[in-house]
Amino acid sequence: MSETNGGNAARENSEVKQTAVENPIDKLDGTPKRPREKDQDEQAEETSDKSEAPNKNDEEKKEEGKKDQEPSHKKIKVDDGKTVESGIVEDDKKEDKFVFGAASKFGTGFGVAKKDTKDGDATTSTESLPASDSKTKKPFAFGSGLSFGSGFNILKNKTENNSESEKKATDVDKDKVHSGSEQLANASEDTKDKPKPLKLQKQEVKSGEESEECIYQVNAKLYQLSNIKEGWKERGVGIIKINKSKDDVEKTRIVMRSRGILKVILNIQLVKGFTVQKGFTGSLQSEKFIRLLAVDDNGDPAQYAIKTGKKETTDELYNIIVKSVPK
């Protein structure tokens, strides 16, 4: 009990002290204000009054604007017998704006089609199109309303003409193929009718040396001198032979044929008094030459020079010719 009494007494003392402290502050609030502070308070009140006035004016203007925005919808009768609000009609008139090129021919090529949206349904209006176009609508074609738009039709006509020409060409080709096949068939029949070529038989070609015996032969080159003004001329290259007759031992001749075509370029019969000489004064290789005096094909006197590849072969040829000359 004593403790509780002591606690209550302490609380009462603290409350008394607080009131003692608060009272002087309240007294300070009641002190008179300075003249400068009064002027500031008056100015603040005036500004607050002014701000409230324009706010009221703004609210009034907003309300007037809303009234102006509200459409004055009046019902108007249309030709179809339906009633439409006048505000909607005015809005539709406002939507019809000027389109660049709508009155020209070029503008019609793009198809002037307007879309009227009413109650969520989309309908196309044909106000600017003539009556004939509204009845029969043609598919849109770029440049159809222009003066040069007919160029596309010309191309179309050309394609049709081309298709016709192609058909004609195919028909002509078929005719050609048919005629060609007929020609081939006729040609095959002609070949069957033609007689077959005869088979050729091999025949023996006689050179005139069959009844002779070759004593000596060697490769050589032949030169001929018929006219001193013309000089020596080369007759050809081939094999020179010394042939002796099988029937008559005393008959011997010198035969030379050109290589390849086997043409006779030298044919001399060895007789009494036939002369053979060694060497050739006009050549640096005179030891490889031998010379013969005889008569040419025309019966005129001529001189022949025979050249071999080696000196030894030239000596052998010379010795055999000298021995074969009849005495």
UniProtKB/Swiss-Prot annotation:
PROSITE patterns: RANBD1
Domain RanBD1: 191-327
Annotated Gene Ontology cellular component terms: cytosol; nucleus
CDD domains named in the record: RanBD_RanBP3 (cd13180)
Transmembrane segments: none
Chain segments carrying region Disordered: 1-96, 109-205
Biased composition (Polar residues): 122-133
Subcellular location as annotated: Nucleus
GO biological process, one term: protein export from nucleus
Modification type Phosphothreonine: residues: 31
Additional remark text: Present with 3620 molecules/cell in log phase SD medium.
Oligomeric form and interacting partners: Interacts with GSP1, XPO1 and SRM1.
Protein's name in the database: Ran-specific GTPase-activating protein 2
Gene name per UniProt: YRB2
